[in-house]
Amino acid sequence: MKTAKKVAIALLCAATIAVVPAFAACSSQTYVTGITKSGTDGVYTVYYSDGSTSTFTVPNSSDGVTAEDLYNEYLEQTGDNISYTEFLEKYMTVSAPDTSSTVAYCLQSTLKIYAEFVKPQYNDFNMFVGYDSSVYTGAAVIYDIDKIEDGYTYLITNYHVVYLAEANTERNGDSNIARAIYGYLYGSDGSPTASGRGSDGYTSYDYGDYGIKLEYVGGSVESDIAVLKVPTEDIKAINENIQAVDIADDYHVGETAIAIGNPEGNGLSVTQGVISTENEQITLSIDGIERAYRSLRIDTPIYSGNSGGGLFNSEGKLIGITNAGNTDDQNINYAVPIEIVTGTADNIIHYANDGDDSTTDAYSITFGINVTSSGAKYVYDSSTGYGEITENVNVYSVNADTIADAIGLKQGDVIKSLVVNGTEKAITRTFNLSDIALTLRAGDSVSFVVERDGETVTTSSHTLVQSDFHQI
C-alpha cells in the first residue's frame, strides 16, 4: 500500500545513511552507499561505492521517497532482474513504528478517575450489613480547555464510570451519579485513603494534594458517555502543561489502537493493539436496562479500570473511549467510536450552557423512519491505503406525524444524504443517521436527498424545535 511504503522508507532512510547498505545485484558490482534528498523539488542523489553519483526525481515527494521508488531506481542502475518482494526482503529492513513518543504526548491529556458512591454493603455470606461509601475507578481524557471561555476544562469519561445502579439514591445525594469525583493527572499520582467517618456516618476519603475535584456536567446512558468539568486554574495548578486531546477524523480496520487507562486502580498504564471491527453491536446493562451499543472492536488488552480512558491511533489522535471487554477472551474488547464520543460530549456541553435549566444531559431526535440496508460492499481507496464498507440505506417505513412524514420521505426511498443547514452529509451506513442526530440542535434545518424511482429527489425541509428532541 502507498501509505505503508512511505512509512517503511521514513523508517529506513536514516538507517540508509547510517549503516551504508549495499544495493547491489552481486558483490562484484558497484553498489549504492547512500540516498539523500538534495532539493525541494523531489530531487534525490544516489551515492555509489566507486564515488560516483546520480540523481532521480520523485514527484510530490514531500512525504519522502517510497520503497517502490527505490526499487525502480535500483533496477535502472543495476539492471538486476529481481522482484519487488525480493528487493524488500534483501535490502529493506522495516521495523514497527516506535509509539513511545505518541504515548508520551497522549499522557498529557489523561487522568485516572475515582468515583464515590453510597451503596448497600454485604458480608462474605452475602448478608446485608448496612450502607457505606465505596470508591470505583476509571479514567478520563481532557476534551476542552476553556474553549468556550467559561473558565472550565471539560473531561470525557464513560457514563458507567460515574453512574452506579446499585447506589442508594436517598443516601447518595438523591442520584445514582457519584457523590464525589476526583481525578489524578499522569505524573501527579495519588489515590484516596479512608480517613474515618464523615458527619453522615459513612467512610470519608482523603484524596491528597494531587486529587482534583471534578464536577459532573451531564451524561448519556444510551451513548455511555459523560462529561466532567473543573476550573481550569485548578487543574493547571497541578500541571500547567496539560493538553486537550487531538481528535481523529476517521479510523480504519487494522489501524493501531493504543489504550491508556487505570487498570485495577493501579495507576495509568498503556496497552496496544489494532482495530478489529469498525461497527459491532454489543449489549450492556448500565442502569438495569439492557441496551445495544455500536462499538469499535479492538484486540487491545483492557482491564477493569480502563473504562473512560482514551483509545488513540499511532498519531496520538483520539479514536474512541474504551468501555467494555470480553471476560472470556482478552483479545476482544470494545470502545465507543469517536463520532459518538464527540457528538455526545458537545451535545452535553451545549445543553449545560444554554441558559435553560430544563435541559440537561444529552438530546437526540427521532426522524420517524425505519431503515434497512442492502448492497453492502468493501471499497478500497488506494490513495489513502484504507478501505471502508458502504451500503444502501433504504426507507422501509415512515411513521405518521413525524419529521420524516412532514418532509415527504417515502417507503422505498434510498437515502443518499442528510442536508443540515444547507450542508450535505453523506449517508453510507445506517448508523450515520443516529451519529448526525447527536449534532443537531433546535433551529437547524434538515432535509434529505434520496433516490426515488431512479431519480434524485430532495425532500422539503423542516426546522427543528426543542420538542423534536428527546433525552438520551
Regions found by a protein language model. Give the residues of each.
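Gram-positive cell-envelope targeting signals
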Residues: M1-T30, T102-V103, L111-I113, Y154-L155, ...
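Collagen/collagen-like triple-helix sequence repeat recognition
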Residues: S27-T93
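A conserved glycine-rich beta-strand in the N-terminal activation segment of trypsin-fold
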Residues: A96-S100, Y122-I156, G211-K213, D246, ...
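C-terminal cap/linker of serine protease catalytic domains
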Residues: D98, A178-I181, L318-Y386
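Gly/Ser-enriched beta-turn/beta-hairpin loop segments
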Residues: V129-Y131, V217-S223, K236, E278-L296, ...
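Catalytic-histidine neighborhood of serine endopeptidases
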Residues: D144-S223, E233
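Active-site loop architecture of trypsin-fold serine endopeptidases
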Residues: Y159-D174, I235-I242, I260-G273, I282-G308, ...
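PDZ/PDZ-like groove recognition
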Residues: A226, P301, H350-A442, V449-E451, ...
